[in-house]
Amino acid sequence: MREMQLASALTTRPARRILFLCIHNSARSQMAEGWARSLAGPEVQIWSAGTEPSRVHPAAIEVMREVGIDLTKQASKGLEDVPWQTMDTVVTVCGEGDEVCPVLAADVRRVHWPLPDPSRVEGEGQLDAFRKVRDDLRWRVASLLPRGD
C-alpha cells in the first residue's frame, strides 16, 4: 500500500541519475545510497552527499551489514564532490530538505522524504531507530528505480 502511494506521487519517468542529499551525509543518505546500489541495475548512477559532510555513522554501517550491504567503502561527501548539476532526481532525506537542497534546473525531479534522524536517539534504542529508517528507506528507494531492477 505504501509503495503504491509513493509511486503514484512520483512522475512516471524512471530515475537514472539519483542524488540522496542531507546535511551531514552520515546516516540516512548513506543508507539510501547503499540500498540504491544494491537494488538498481547498472544503468542507474547513484550518489549521496551532504551540505556539511562529516563521517559515515558506525550504526548505519552496522545495520546495513545486517541486510548484507557493505557501507565501509562509502564516504561522507559534500556537494562539491558529486556531479549534482547533472542529476535527474534529487532526494532529500532529512527534515530540512528545502533548506539543504541546491538550486536545481527545472527538469530535475525533487523528492523529499522527511525521515527522522536516528543518530539523535541515544542509548539502547539507537540501533532500533537506525533499523527502522533502514527498512523505511528500502521500499522508498525501490519505488524510485526503473521497473525490473
What is each model feature region?
Residues 26, 95-99:
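Short glycine-rich anion-binding loops that position phosphate/pyrophosphate groups of nucleotides
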Residues 2-9, 98-149:
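Phosphate-binding/catalytic loops
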Residues 89:
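Short, Asp-centered acidic motifs that coordinate Mg2+ and/or phosphate
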Residues 92-93, 112:
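Redox-cofactor binding/interface segments in oxidoreductases and associated redox assembly factors
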Residues 84-86:
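Alpha-helix C-terminal capping/helix-to-coil transition sites in glycosyltransferase folds
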Residues 54-55, 81, 116-121:
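A short acidic, often aromatic-flanked loop/helix-cap motif at beta-alpha or helix-coil junctions
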Residues 2-80:
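Conserved active-site segments centered on acidic
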